[in-house]
Amino acid sequence: MALLARHLQVEHRVLRYDRRGYARSWPHAGPFSVDDQVEDLVGLVGARKVVLIGHSFGGNIALSAAARLGTQVIGVSTYETPLSWMDWWPGTTAGAMAVASSESDAAENFMVRLIGPKRWNELPERTRGERRREGAALIGELNALRMKAPWSVEDISCPVLCGYGSNGAKHHVEGARWLATNLKIARLVELSDAAHSAP
């Protein structure tokens, strides 16, 4: 997201923030549901017209905010957004494995599944420690997402770009396709040579 933000801020005002329980928003006692995350986002954007961009779990926040804010949201872009509440979503994803762990291991297990053990071990100890402490937020978010749909396609009226990487996991590709097929105004976009972490 940082690279994308740098490109966009040449011509647009860009607001990036750390979700509750992560990076500069740590520590946070929660809760970590999509609804609570949307409250945070709504507080940040105020009454401005916005385009919302959400990567992974952030896509659900963007879609839920679009449903809530209506015409204030000009458009949404999602990338490999998990649809964990759907019965076809696999129970063997990085997210599913993370929530089966203790809080202290959840974020590490999640990261190792995403970037591999070699890259994880190459991270500085400080960075690994920062990621591990985010386990409570990660478990809270993923458990909430598995329990119920955080938005309804009928409530989203803005255009949505539904992105996935050509090297992405099958369930992320299928999730992006589902969004593009079921949202009112949507387009499917494949990023060549990209995986879940995007370019």
Where is each model-derived feature located?
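Alpha/beta-hydrolase active-site loop signature
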Residues: 19-23, 83, 195-196
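Helix-loop "lid/cap" segments that line or gate small-molecule binding pockets
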Residues: 94-99, 107-120, 140-144
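Conserved serine/cysteine hydrolase catalytic core
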Residues: 127-182, 187-190, 198-199
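Active-site loop/oxyanion-hole signature of alpha/beta-hydrolase fold enzymes
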Residues: 6, 15-53
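Flexible "cap/lid" loop of the alpha/beta hydrolase fold
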Residues: 60-102
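The serine-hydrolase catalytic nucleophile loop
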Residues: 1-5
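A short beta-to-alpha transition loop/helix N-cap that caps and shapes the active-site region
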Residues: 24, 82-90, 117-119, 170
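Catalytic nucleophile serine of serine hydrolases
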Residues: 56
